[in-house]
């Protein structure tokens, strides 16, 4: 892959990811080879960066973009072609690409769940239809997204997506079982208070803390919660427990700046859509950290205070 132009920072990271992923240039040995997998991955990430539909992205963003020459495209893909690319890469491949952007050194993590609109609909017209319409509109479906975040660098380490009302503990168990980073601390809110979750977390290298839920009013005040790890969380909470709010900040930034809603109708495609969004989010974090390392400036301000005697006459002599 020879690039005859100076790369921008996003393109540089895309090249690094593709070379590290060990994906072949083409999945097929014979047949049509108009597009390479590097071009497919790059265009899908650019699609998620735009936040537009497939047709709008092709007509407004890609048609007159420099990325056509940067990626070496022989022709602009059509909407149906781009849709086929979204189905081409499985969740296993997307997670493999995602793991390439995870930092190697992680000390403190946090987990939290949030809801994302999975059916884009105007709230204003929804309210007007309910006021004047004879029939109520069907309820809005929300995709429950749980994010496992590196607190220090704000990278997303893992995620899970469900369309049902599943408890936070069950989702966290799946995320912790997939964890491969050892000797780290984890933080969660009261929704993750479970002795079984503490055991799973420690079995997978996570020293997890979650505040204990409020007990029954009829219980004694000095009654201790059941479970060894739950008692530890109540009696010896860590000093950095307030850092859990950073995962809420990551959720807010992700929903306000990148994922307004999930456009896909099928759940399998929603998972892939969210996966590509999170890949682009971590790419932005990588680019942001490299920028901060390259442009680190320190200013030393010295302030000297000089004291001059006041030669004005005293008020008594006036």
Model-derived segments and spans:
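Polybasic low-complexity intrinsically disordered regions
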Residues: 32-33, 46-49, 59, 84, ...
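Basic, short loop/linker segments at the boundary and entry of helix-turn-helix/winged-helix-like folds
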Residues: 3-49
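DNA-recognition alpha helix
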Residues: 54-71
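Helix-centered, glycine/charged polyanion-binding patches within enzymatic domains
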Residues: 190-257
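Basic, amphipathic alpha-helical segments enriched in Lys/Arg and hydrophobic/aromatic residues
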Residues: 232-318
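Major-groove recognition helix of helix-turn-helix-like DNA-binding domains
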Residues: 69-89
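Non-catalytic DNA-binding core/recognition domains of DNA-processing enzymes
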Residues: 36-39, 61-63, 78
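A short glycine/serine-rich beta->alpha loop
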Residues: 27-33, 70-71, 134, 264-266
